[in-house]
C-alpha cells in the first residue's frame, strides 16, 4: 500500500464510480424519465410497449441526457442520488410544453452550487407551472416516490423487484439492468486493494445505493467480508434519518460519511448535533469520484482522495484540484 495511507485508520468509500460502475444506474434513470413523461401509466398519453426498451436503452439515454451532458452537469453540481438525477430531469422537463432535454441541460448548467437548496426551488417552479400541491413535488414527496419506484423497476427487473419490495411491479416486463453490473476497474484489482487495505484499516461505505443493491455486488465479487459490518452505510439509513428528522441528508451533506465512521447504530440526532468524537476524523480518508463526495468530505473535515473513474474521467482532475483534494488517483488500483 502507498505510504500516504499510513496516517489513516479508516477509509470510507463511495461505491459508484469508485468500486462499482454507475452505467446501469444512468441507463435506469434515462428509462425512468422516458417512461414517466410518455406513458399513460404516469403523466404521458402513450400506451408504451415496454419490451423494446430492454434492448434500446442506450439510445434512450443518449436522447434524455443529451449524450450524458445532463449527467455531467448535475453530478458536477453535487447531485448524488440517481433517483434525484431522474427527478430533476423530469421536473425540469415538465416546465416546458414540449419535452426538450436541451432545456434540461441549460437548467442544470445554471443551477447554483448549493444543490440541497435547488430541490425546493425547482419543486416550487414546477408546482406553479403544472398545478397541484407543492408538497407533491418536493423531494421525497409523492412524485419523487413514484419516480423512485419506476426507477427501481427498471434497475431490479420484475423478479428481484418483487423479492425486495414484496409486491408486483406497477409495470411488468422489465428484465433488470442489475444483471449487467460490472466493477469500474478489473475485479482482481478491486479485490487486491480492498483486501490489502483491510489488513490495517477499518473499511466503510457511504453509498447512494439501498442495502440490497450495495450487498449484491460486494457479496458476489467476494469483497464484503473486508468491510466493517457497522460501517456499511447505504441509502436506507438516509431515508430513515430524513423521515425521522425532516432534513435532507443525502450527499453533499456529510451525514453518510459520519454515519459510516461512528457506526450505523450511532444515534442520528447526535450526528446532526455534532455530538461525536471529532478527533477520529483526523485519521479518516474518504475515497470518491464526484462533487458530492468531496463536498461532503470537506464538510465533515476529512481528507479526500479523488479517483478519476467517475462520470467525467480524467477531465475531473482540474475540478478536484480546484477543491483542494488531498490526493488524486487514476483509480483505487493506485492505492497499491
Regions found by a protein language model. Give the residues of each.
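Acidic, Mg2+-coordinating phosphoryl-transfer loop and its flanking beta/alpha structural elements
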Residues: 208, 285-327
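Short acidic-hydrophobic, aromatic-tinged amphipathic segments that line or gate anion-handling sites
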Residues: 233-234, 326-335
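Substrate-recognition "cap/lid" segment bordering the active-site pocket of phosphatases
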Residues: 181-185, 204, 210-285, 291, ...
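Short, acidic loop-to-helix structural element flanking the phosphoryl-transfer center
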Residues: 2, 12, 132, 149, ...
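Short beta->alpha linker loops
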Residues: 24, 209-210, 252, 289, ...
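Phosphate/oxyanion-binding active-site loops and adjacent basic polyanion-contact surfaces
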Residues: 21-25, 78-82, 186, 249-257
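Non-catalytic, alpha-helical, charged scaffold/linker segments
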Residues: 39-40, 47-158
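Active-site neighborhood of HAD-like aspartate-dependent phosphohydrolases
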Residues: 1-66, 84-87
Amino acid at each position: 500500500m502507498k505510504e500516504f495511507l499510513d496516517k489513516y485508520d479508516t477509509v470510507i468509500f463511495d461505491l459508484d464510480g469508485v468500486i462499482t460502475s454507475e452505467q446501469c444506474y444512468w441507463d435506469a434513470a434515462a428509462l425512468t424519465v422516458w417512461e414517466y413523461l410518455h406513458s399513460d401509466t404516469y403523466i404521458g398519453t402513450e400506451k408504451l410497449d415496454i419490451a423494446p426498451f430492454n434492448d434500446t436503452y442506450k439510445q434512450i439515454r443518449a436522447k434524455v441526457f443529451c449524450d450524458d451532458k445532463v449527467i455531467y452537469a448535475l453530478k458536477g453540481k453535487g447531485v448524488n442520488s440517481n433517483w434525484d438525477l431522474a427527478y430533476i430531469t423530469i421536473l425540469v422537463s415538465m416546465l416546458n410544453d414540449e419535452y426538450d432535454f436541451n432545456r434540461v441541460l441549460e437548467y442544470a448548467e445554471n443551477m447554483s452550487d448549493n444543490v440541497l437548496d435547488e430541490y425546493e426551488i425547482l419543486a416550487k417552479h414546477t408546482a406553479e407551472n403544472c398545478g397541484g400541491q407543492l408538497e407533491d413535488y418536493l423531494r421525497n414527496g409523492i412524485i419523487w416516490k413514484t419516480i423512485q419506484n419506476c426507477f427501481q423497476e427498471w434497475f431490479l427487473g420484475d423478479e428481484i423487484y418483487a423479492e425486495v419490495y414484496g409486491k408486483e411491479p406497477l409495470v411488468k416486463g422489465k428484465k433488470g439492468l442489475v444483471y449487467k453490473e460490472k466493477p469500474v476497474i478489473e475485479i482482481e484489482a478491486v479485490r487486491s486493494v480492498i483486501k490489502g487495505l483491510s489488513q490495517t484499516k477499518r473499511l466503510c461505505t457511504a453509498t447512494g445505493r439501498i442495502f440490497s443493491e450495495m450487498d449484491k455486488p460486494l457479496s458476489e465479487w467476494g469483497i464484503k467480508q473486508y468491510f466493517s459490518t457497522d460501517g456499511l452505510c447505504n441509502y436506507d439509513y438516509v431515508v430513515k434519518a430524513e423521515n425521522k428528522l425532516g432534513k435532507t441528508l443525502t450527499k453533499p451533506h456529510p451525514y453518510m460519511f459520519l454515519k459510516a465512521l461512528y457506526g450505523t447504530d450511532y444515534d442520528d440526532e447526535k450526528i446532526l448535533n455534532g455530538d461525536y468524537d471529532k478527533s477520529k476524523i483526523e485519521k479518516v480518508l474518504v475515497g470518491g469520484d464526484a462533487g458530492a463526495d468531496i463536498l461532503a468530505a470537506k464538510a465533515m473535515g476529512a481528507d479526500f482522495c479523488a479517483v478519476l473513474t467517475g462520470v467525467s474521467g480524467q477531465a475531473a482532475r482540474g475540478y478536484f484540484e480546484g477543491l483542494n483534494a488531498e490526493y488524486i488517483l487514476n483509480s483505487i488500483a493506485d492505492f497499491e
